[in-house]
Amino acid sequence: MSGRGKGGKGLGKGGAKRHRKVLRDNIQGITKPAIRRLARRGGVKRISGLIYEETRGVLKVFLENVIRDAVTYCEHAKRKTVTSMDVVYALKRQGRTLYGFGG
């Protein structure tokens, strides 16, 4: 052991950088039937064809904001793993309190 303690936050030997796959156009993974099911749950009977792209755009912006806040909480705590509590606090910060995930 090199005496760095929990997490090993020292400099280390460097190691190989991991290559991350560039993620793009994943918003299309939110399929038309998935959006339709969400609308049905909200009580919508009939859906315009233009709704699907608009919904994807709105969902993308919402998730970007929540994830940015959750990652900020995570970085402040000097962790590399985003926990459910980070997400709960991020949602609370935006005025959308979520119950049932601890805290």
UniProtKB/Swiss-Prot annotation:
Residues 17-21 bind DNA. Residues 1-20 are annotated as: Disordered. The modification N-acetylserine is found at S2. One of its GO terms (molecular function) is structural constituent of chromatin. PROSITE patterns: HISTONE_H4 (PS00047). Residues 1-14 have a biased composition (Gly residues). It is found in: Nucleus; Chromosome. This is Histone H4.
